Amino acid sequence: MSGSCQFLSRETLSSSLGWIPLINALREIFTENVVCPTRLHYPIDEDNPSSTANNILLIMPCWIPGKFLGVKQVNVFPENTKHGLPSLSSHYLLSDATTGCHLAQLDGNELTSRRTAAASALASSYLSKEDSTSLLIIGSGKVAEKLIHAHCSVRPIRSVRIWNHRFESAKSLASRASKELPSIQIDAVPIQNLENAVKCSDIISSATLSKKPIIVGSWINPGTHIDLVGGFTPHMHEADSKCIQISNVFVDTRKGALHEAGDLLTPIKEGLFSPNEVIADLFDLCNNKHSGRSQLKNPAEAITLFKSVGDSREDLAAASLAYKVHNKSS
């Protein structure tokens, strides 16, 4: 691991990070000895009383002793969408953990969206029914787009519905995804038809920055798997408290989800859910300490819910895989 620092673009990451290899890399890193300090989280407008923005700076370091060292900077500016700009901008720096030499700078947005979707698919491989054929995507951003491909890589999905509070955005994503996955029926859901779409879906995957619940617990049918991706602060909510109450809850990491996920912290504060009710995290699943849906009482009818807030070991797994694949092929 030597030489000049490379730049791995969005296009390079897209070609280097196939879904199954990436999912397997995530599965493996949750079994390894990884140093993963707490993510640093800074509300950058906190000291500006005149600002109504909720802009956030995230710093996420991680390393495997003797192998790779990485750090990601993420800037979250939710109001950017009003100006036609991305709400999330990031970059990743990968280094040699033995020498400290920089190996590669990677497009952080592509890295984040791909590893996030892959983590959801990894969880789904344990938690959704193996014969799941219908997928509902809530949201229409970059992560939502990746979630379609990731979920379809682990389950025999035949139909995908996309819902967004801006219908035209959902239609645009449906059009793009249909061209990329021509064998799958992909449609946009009219804004008023969300409840019916939820009731008709085997897997529901939500990737929004919503501060108000979108998914209502009373809409959920037995056997459904719910994947909550978007909310990564205590003030964000994609599902109501009833949805958490009726579900068998799994998380990416207990430390992260129980500290940052509003979808869990709100029902905990309301006395409707306890941290002890989290059944397992990705460490448990990947190390065979819990088998997921198959270990639940009445697996066919169980409602499963996976809440993720992101973890820096996922970035390191994706970045190191991309670096190795790119250098093997170049």
Curated annotation (Swiss-Prot):
SUPFAM superfamilies: NAD(P)-binding Rossmann-fold domains. Keywords: Cytoplasm. One of its GO terms (molecular function) is catalytic activity. Pfam families: OCD_Mu_crystall (PF02423). One of its GO terms (cellular component) is cytoplasm. It is found in: Cytoplasm. Its main location: cytoplasm. Belongs to the ornithine cyclodeaminase/mu-crystallin family. This is Uncharacterized protein P11E10.01. It comes from Schizosaccharomyces pombe (strain 972 / ATCC 24843) (Fission yeast).
